[in-house]
UniProtKB/Swiss-Prot annotation:
Location in the cell: Nucleus; Cytoplasm
Bias-annotated ranges (Polar residues): 56-92
One record GO biological process: convergent extension
Name of the protein in question: Immediate early response gene 2 protein
Disruption phenotype: Morpholino knockdown of the protein causes severe deficits in laterality. Partial loss of Kupffer's vesicle cilia with the length of the remaining cilia reduced. Double morpholino knockdown of IER2 and FIBPB causes an almost complete loss of Kupffer's vesicle cilia.
Basic and acidic residues biased stretches: 93-103
Source organism: Danio rerio
Disordered: annotated span: 53-135
Family: Belongs to the IER family.
Function: DNA-binding protein that seems to act as a transcription factor. Mediates with FIBPB FGF-signaling in Kupffer's vesicle ciliogenesis and in the establishment of laterality in the embryo.
Signal sequence range: none
Amino acid sequence: MDVTAEAKQIMVQALGKMYSSRSQRGGLRLHRSLLLTLVMKSARDIYHSARLMSEKSGQSVTEECTSHTQEPMDTSSSTATPLRETSGQSSEDGQRSGLEGHPHPLNPAADKENCGPSRPDRHSRKRRSKTATDSDFIPCKKAKLECAEVRGVLQNSSANCGRALDSLSLVPMPRTIVTF
């Protein structure tokens, strides 16, 4: 199928689904995100199949190319592939261990999808704490008062409830004003 015809088919399907989902509660917004996922998956499958076709045409193997263009690529593991790979697994392990230290073994541009951000000047979207930005560390807790300071504060704020020679006046009592 031609790429433009497939794109038109996806667009018609998307418009039909958006029209039918507009009456649902929150359906349109949810459908847009699901539709974007569907379009990206189908575009990725088309890209990979076209890439396989260009690689296979260089090797002049046309039978395998037609099978890849008719079905989208399956990313899940199949049971037939591990049976064939068990005999050559020990030789592949030796090759893989040599490549583990290198994140881009052959072609760094081949795996753009799984790479980090290409520009180092791009800022992260995480919020930074104030302590990370300030060079001077300011403690968030208040300093505790010493016992002598607490007594002095309580004596200054105590009420004079009795006579000067009364024993009750020696006990500090904080002032409390109740309002209704």
